């Protein structure tokens, strides 16, 4: 769960003018050619969207617009794709976003309408209503839940810890439970949104699914750190890696949150990790390294 840079709306007027037009198909006139005044009415809805930080409002549905104009804007959404008339909207949205801002698990591959286009038709091609998400997050969102999720562009997340994980070792395996901290220093409306999406997107289950495969990559490092410096070495390794990943991603990304929790778990650091992540080769590698250092020091 993280913020993304707010897209520019400098081309908003030109975008509407580009995708709204009439054409003839099988001797039948289709499409919609808005007047200048109608374009300004749509831009006023964009202004209201910005002012209310993307929160749901009846006025954003365009009750003052004609049904034909609302429908034409909604049907213009495919024009944001590669071969459409306004592909820059999609290109800009995905630029420099390598991970879904909601889950932090998978890369974004789809544009989500923060306020659903089936309900808020005038916002169908508005750049600030289009958020890049992964397939799983976008697929789990329901149109009826518009406004219940944190807005990646407008709901500014303060630099506080709100995601936490309980860790335990059971039957030789690592057991994790992710949750949102009710005591986190967040405005109540924002906290409610984050808690809602944690449940609605099944983030705890999705994080847990990736925990074991992620930790396997740290097997050798953990064993070597422990063999050379004991439990303190394990803690140092976990905290150092957590610092690196928190800087790379963000403090509430599920991976650094997990590493910090493991660093604080005495049972895991003082040997429990060997059961969870067995590696018979790590001890040999540590011995070889120690022997090499001894030779070099001689």
Please report, for each region that a protein language model flagged, where it lies by residue.
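Long alpha-helical scaffolds
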Residues: 39-43, 108, 226-230, 234
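C-terminal, charged low-complexity interaction regions
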Residues: 1-26, 193-298
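Generic hydrophobic, aliphatic-rich segments that mediate packing or membrane embedding
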Residues: 65, 69, 85, 96-99, ...
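N-terminal accessory alpha/beta regions
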Residues: 2-83
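Short cysteine-rich loop/turn motifs with clustered Cys
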Residues: 88-110, 134
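Short Cys/His-rich Zn2+-coordinating modules
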Residues: 76-90, 112-119
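Short secondary-structure junctions and interdomain/linker hinges
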Residues: 27, 80, 96, 160-161, ...
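Glycine- and acidic-residue-rich phosphate-binding/metal-coordinating active-site segment common to enzymes
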Residues: 107-189
């Amino acid at each position: 769960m993280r913020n993304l840079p707010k897209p520019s709306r400098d081309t908003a007027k030109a975008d509407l003018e580009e995708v709204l037009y009439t054409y003839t198909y099988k001797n039948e006139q289709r499409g919609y050619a808005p007047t200048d005044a109608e374009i300004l009415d749509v831009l006023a809805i964009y202004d209201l969207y910005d002012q209310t930080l993307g929160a749901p409002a009846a006025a954003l549905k365009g009750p003052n617009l004609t049904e034909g104009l609302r429908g034409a804007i909604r049907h213009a959404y495919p024009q944001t794709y590669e071969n459409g008339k306004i592909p820059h909207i999609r290109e800009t949205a995905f630029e420099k976003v390598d991970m879904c801002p909601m889950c932090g698990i998978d890369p974004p591959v789809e544009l989500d309408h923060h306020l659903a286009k089936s309900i808020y038709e005038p916002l169908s091609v508005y750049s600030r209503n289009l958020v890049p998400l992964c397939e799983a997050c976008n697929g789990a969102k329901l149109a009826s839940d518009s406004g219940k999720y944190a807005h990646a562009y407008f709901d500014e997340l303060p630099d506080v810890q709100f995601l936490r994980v309980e860790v335990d070792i059971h039957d030789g395996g690592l057991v994790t439970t992710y949750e949102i901290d009710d005591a986190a220093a967040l405005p109540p409306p924002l906290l409610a949104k984050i808690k809602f999406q944690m449940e609605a997107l099944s983030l705890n289950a999705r994080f847990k699914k990736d925990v074991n495969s992620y930790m396997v990559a740290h097997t050798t490092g953990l064993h070597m750190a422990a063999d050379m410096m004991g439990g303190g070495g394990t803690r140092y390794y976990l905290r150092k890696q957590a610092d690196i990943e928190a800087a790379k991603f963000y403090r509430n990304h599920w991976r650094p949150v997990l590493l910090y929790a493991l660093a604080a778990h005495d049972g895991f650091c003082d040997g429990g990790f060997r059961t969870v992540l067995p590696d018979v080769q790590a001890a040999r590698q540590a011995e070889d390294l120690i022997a090499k250092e001894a030779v070099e020091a001689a």
